[in-house]
Curated annotation (Swiss-Prot):
Catalytic activity: a 2'-deoxyribonucleoside 5'-diphosphate + ATP = a 2'-deoxyribonucleoside 5'-triphosphate + ADP; a ribonucleoside 5'-diphosphate + ATP = a ribonucleoside 5'-triphosphate + ADP
Enzyme class: transferase
Protein name: Nucleoside diphosphate kinase
Source taxon at top rank: Bacteria
E.C. designation(s): 2.7.4.6
Pfam families in the record: NDK
InterPro entries: NDK-like_dom, NDK-like_dom_sf, Nucleoside_diP_kinase, Nucleoside_diP_kinase_AS
An example Gene Ontology biological process: CTP biosynthetic process
Organism: Shewanella sp. (strain ANA-3)
GO MF annotation list: ATP binding; metal ion binding; nucleoside diphosphate kinase activity
């Protein structure tokens, strides 16, 4: 088992509904440790840059509008096979198809506003972590 780091966003809908603590509890219950965290209100440019891979999709404008609609929490999670472990507790992109007990099944209303983000691979995790955090902001959990 490899210790990995992955990147998480609690999106504006879940922050607005006061679900930050409940979602952090899901991370910790799954054995994922938070090694960096902060609240941000994304600019249009930040949201467009983060989701650049989707810039040609029909939903891109709606996605950027949603992601800039209120504050978010961004965090780095560390643990065994963290990328996959985090995607598993997150659930499918469309909450209507997310497995019972997953974050998106329990906290999201629709594919447009689906509560949380998780990196889909180690490479995207490294890129997404670096998009929001400097190396000095990551706090190894050695104790
Ligand atoms: P994820 O990795 O599970 O978040 O899914 P994707 O990388 O495929 O899409 C990124 C984000 O774009 C999703 O989490 C949704 O917020 C949004 N998204 C994806 N598909 C749709 C769609 O059909 N309509 C809208 N409005 N948003 C979508
Ligand atoms: Mg994705």
């Amino acid at each position: 088992m490899a210790i990995e780091r992955t990147f998480s966003i609690i999106k504006p809908d879940a922050v607005a509904k006061n679900h930050i603590g409940a979602i952090y509890n899901r991370f910790e219950t799954a054995g994922l440790k938070i090694v960096a965290a902060k609240m941000l209100h994304l600019t249009k440019e930040q949201a467009e840059g983060f989701y650049a891979e989707h810039s040609e999709r029909g939903f891109f404008g709606a996605l950027v509008a949603f992601m800039t609609s209120g504050p978010i929490m961004v965090q780095v999670l560390e643990g065994e096979n963290a990328v996959l472990a985090h995607r598993e507790i997150l659930g499918a992109t469309n909450p209507a198809q997310a497995a019972p007990g997953t974050i998106r099944a329990d906290f999201a209303e629709s594919i447009d506003e689906n509560a949380a983000h998780g990196s889909d691979a180690l490479e995207s995790a490294a890129r997404e972590i670096a998009y929001f955090f400097s190396a000095e902001e990551l706090c190894p959990r050695t104790r």
